[in-house]
Amino acid sequence: MHGTVLPPLKKGWQATLDLRFHQAGGKTVLASAQHVGPLTVQRPFYPEEETCHLYLLHPPGGIVGGDELTISAHLAPGCHTLITMPGASKFYRSSGAQALVRQQLTLAPQATLEWLPQDAIFFPGANARLFTTFHLCASSRLLAWDLLCLGRPVIGETFSHGTLSNRLEVWVDDEPLLVERLQLQEGELSSVAERPWVGTLLCYPATDALLDGVRDALAPLGLYAGASLTDRLLTVRFLSDDNLICQRVMRDVWQFLRPHLTGKSPVLPRIWLT
């Protein structure tokens, strides 16, 4: 596997979660969930019979400087798993130590992953580094999104100070399709047009027809949204001032893409409806 080596941190929560999915009896099952510290999952749901819906639980009370969380998931051939969370991930102000979250998702041939976490909220003064990597095979299928909230715009609070590094990678058969990094420091938000909401959505494999359909769905976001298709990887990026529009557009794009990618109608995770 390729990727960036990150140095270990000390202090705070040192939590790990390793998930293994297999096929058994015609459906995807969570074969093992090994965890250390306050990272765990709820019991899987099966609203679509063979597809496994799983809710990932982050540490109670949010993530602070010095916390180091490592999440990995491995999907065996033919598995189909949807992973989400019951609520937003909150990164609180740090006195100097960095919070680090590593997420590595590995898909075998013919495996399908829908990685649909809730938004990540970064309070002013947070010092956070996130590193998410998807390792796919050519026949794997991926629908994933990443939604960042800088500050708490609902109450007029901006990400006026602090540091955020968000790195996102997609590899197919050990070749990089996407390697990008967002770096924000000390309230300098010009790289995101001073917008508090930053979103990315990924779909693999995709076609020109899907690209056209996604661009239509992005209309509510105006000029601050776009989509591209490179080597069958569809990448959607957008900026916004409005969380409700962001969340609605993300779900609209997911609902449009899912039937084409998986052959299944969209089934909203129950936790989204509560």
Swiss-Prot record:
Keywords assigned: Chaperone, Cytoplasm, Nickel insertion
Database matches in InterPro entries: UreD
Highest taxon listed in the record's lineage: Bacteria
Main location: cytoplasm
GO cellular component, one term: cytoplasm
Pfam families for this protein: UreD (PF01774)
Gene Ontology molecular function terms on file: nickel cation binding
Subcellular location: Cytoplasm
Subunit composition and interactions: UreD, UreF and UreG form a complex that acts as a GTP-hydrolysis-dependent molecular chaperone, activating the urease apoprotein by helping to assemble the nickel containing metallocenter of UreC. The UreE protein probably delivers the nickel.
Function according to Swiss-Prot or TrEMBL: Required for maturation of urease via the functional incorporation of the urease nickel metallocenter.
Annotated family: Belongs to the UreD family.
Listed name of the protein: Urease accessory protein UreD
Gene from which the chain derives: ureD
